[in-house]
């Protein structure tokens, strides 16, 4: 493969995946808004005209259609399977010729899932979440560039480790209903998730900027790109929850 800087390698690997992940839900929302008036379907899904409390168009999914339920279930199962495959693949350090196709399929499925979630909740919150994501990402790039603080220090990594551990515990409690969460509890978890992965963006971007020449290889680029990918995906999911909770 061609000789490039580590940053260029990361961008080559990351940008297509993020484009797919964000492009699919944007397309789904725009297509659904058009289909609600034309009566057409999008990926087999049908929609009804509805409005939110602010009197903005809020496309409603037609839940009476059995295909809709099957679509949600099938996409959820496929997202789970390919997320596990992708995680195991990167943990084992598989080569790029296997990693890229698997991650591409994962990005496509995650994009469809996020699109379905945005349409299910309120696509207007999806737009707000997306704008917020770009603002956070822009700040996460600028801060390490112009700040003298080292975000890759052991203390900062330890703090992030504590945050992610707490987040995992809360998510397990939510998933298996070990503790009955109030609305405040759900909001706290969502904000903790958004803050944690925003800080992880800072950490991983600073890690990339501080990498030396010995780390300029495709294996390192693949790992850093994957970490940044996880940061962005998880951050968007928590932002969607925050805006959906209102």
Residue ranges and their predicted role:
Residues 1-246:
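A hydrophobic alpha-helical transmembrane-helix feature that marks the membrane cores
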């Amino acid at each position: 493969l061609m000789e490039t800087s580590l940053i260029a390698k990361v961008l080559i690997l990351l940008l297509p995946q993020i484009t797919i992940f964000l492009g699919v839900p944007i397309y789904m929302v725009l297509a659904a808004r058009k289909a609600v008036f034309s009566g057409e379907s999008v990926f087999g899904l049908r929609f009804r005209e509805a409005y939110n409390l602010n009197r903005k168009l809020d496309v409603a999914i037609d839940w009476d259609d059995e295909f809709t339920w099957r679509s949600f279930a099938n996409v959820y199962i496929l997202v789970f399977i390919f997320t596990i495959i992708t995680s195991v693949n990167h943990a084992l350090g598989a080569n790029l010729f296997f990693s890229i196709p698997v991650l591409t399929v994962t990005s496509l499925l995650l994009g469809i899932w996020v699109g379905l979630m945005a349409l299910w909740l309120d696509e207007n919150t999806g737009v707000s979440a997306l704008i917020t994501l770009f603002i956070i990402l822009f700040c996460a790039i600028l801060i390490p560039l112009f700040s003298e603080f080292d975000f890759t220090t052991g203390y900062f990594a330890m703090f992030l480790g504590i945050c992610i551990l707490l987040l995992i515990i809360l998510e397990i409690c939510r998933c298996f209903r070990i503790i009955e969460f109030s609305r405040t509890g759900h909001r706290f978890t969502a904000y903790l998730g958004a803050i944690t992965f925003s800080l992880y963006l800072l950490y991983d971007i600073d890690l990339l900027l501080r990498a030396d020449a010995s780390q300029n290889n495709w294996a390192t680029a693949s790992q850093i790109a994957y970490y940044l990918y996880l940061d962005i995906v998880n951050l968007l999911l928590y932002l969607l929850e925050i805006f959906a909770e209102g």
